[in-house]
Amino acid sequence: MVPSVPPPLRPPAHQVDPRAVWWWRLRALALLLVLAVPQVVALLVTGAPAWGATLAGTVVLLLAYGVFVPVVRFRIHRWEVTDEAVYTLSGWLVREWRIAPISRVQTVDTEHGPLQQLLRLATVTVTTASARGAVKIAGLDAAAAAELARSLTATTQAVPGDAT
C-alpha cells in the first residue's frame, strides 16, 4: 500500500463574496449597540462624566473596528475545494490555515443567520474526523454556498471509506 501524500499548503484560490464586508460591519455594529446601550443607561442614571468618556471610547474603537477590520478580513479570507481537499485561510489578527482532506469529510452543512439572509450570504461548514473541529467557509454568496455544498457532498460520496 502506498502512503498518501498530504495536500500541499498553498493560498486558496477564491475570495469570499464582497458582501461579507457588510456582514462583518453589521456584526460590529450589533456589538457596538450591545456594549453602548448599558453605558448610555449608566451615564443617564449616574451622570458621572467617566461614563461619557467610556462611552466615547467604546464608540470610537468599535466604529474603527467596523470600518477597517472587515476590509482586512476580506483581503485575507480565502477558500478552495479540490478533489483532494478543502482549503481555508481566515483571521485578521491571527491567521488560520486549514486543510481538510476530502477523505476525512463527514458532513457538509450550510448556515444562513439573520444578517446573512439579509445580505444573501451563507456559511458552509465541513465537519471532519479531525479533533481540531469543523472547517468553516463564511461569507459566501447563498447560491454559491448551496452549489458548493452539493458539489462537495457528491465529491465525498465518491471517495471510499467512512471518513474516520
Describe the residue ranges of each PLM region.
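N-terminal basic, Ser/Thr-rich segments that initiate or prime the first beta/alpha elements at protein or domain
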Residues: 1-103, 107-164
